[in-house]
Curated annotation (Swiss-Prot):
It comes from Methanosphaera stadtmanae (strain ATCC 43021 / DSM 3091 / JCM 11832 / MCB-3). HAMAP family: Riboflavin_kinase. Its cofactor is Mg(2+). The lineage of its organism: Archaea, Methanobacteriati, Methanobacteriota, Methanomada group, Methanobacteria. Binds 1 Mg(2+) ion per subunit. This is Riboflavin kinase.
Length: 131
């Protein structure tokens, strides 16, 4: 597994709007295996790490958008508290149309992870993805 650290950060509070769009909503359960909470947990990667999607091309899956809303690529992943006592399965979303740099990830899960894991901005987390 690939493992890397990041810090929880606040986003633009817009992901929930997109998560609720019918064009995406119908595909979440089939492709992610769960219905995601209607927002993302933003994670700023540590130590100038960026995720090179070219190296993970065979692991990426796609949620199809339409003319107004772009496709969303995703990787199945696991997010853990820094002490690794609690791990939650989810996915890292890579919207084709995004405002974030490659060092900020958008993580989704079936739960509101800020509440479930008692996370706040600046808290460190660990993300793991299959190689």
């Amino acid at each position: 597994m690939l493992s890397f650290e990041g810090k929880v950060s606040s986003g633009l509070q817009k992901a929930g709007q997109f998560m609720e769009k019918e064009v995406y909503k119908k595909q979440y359960l089939d492709k992610l295996g769960f219905i995601p909470y209607h927002g993302t947990l933003n994670i700023k990667l540590s130590n100038n790490i960026t995720l090179n999607l070219d190296n993970l091309h065979d692991k990426l899956k796609r949620i199809h958008g339409n003319g107004s809303f772009g496709d969303v690529l995703f990787l199945e992943a696991y997010l853990s508290t820094i002490d690794e006592k609690i791990t939650k399965k989810g996915a890292i979303l890579f919207p084709v149309k995004t405002v974030y740099d490659t060092d900020t990830l958008e993580y989704v899960s079936s739960e509101k992870l800020r509440d479930t894991l008692n996370l706040k901005d600046g808290d460190k987390v660990i993300i793991k993805i299959e190689k």
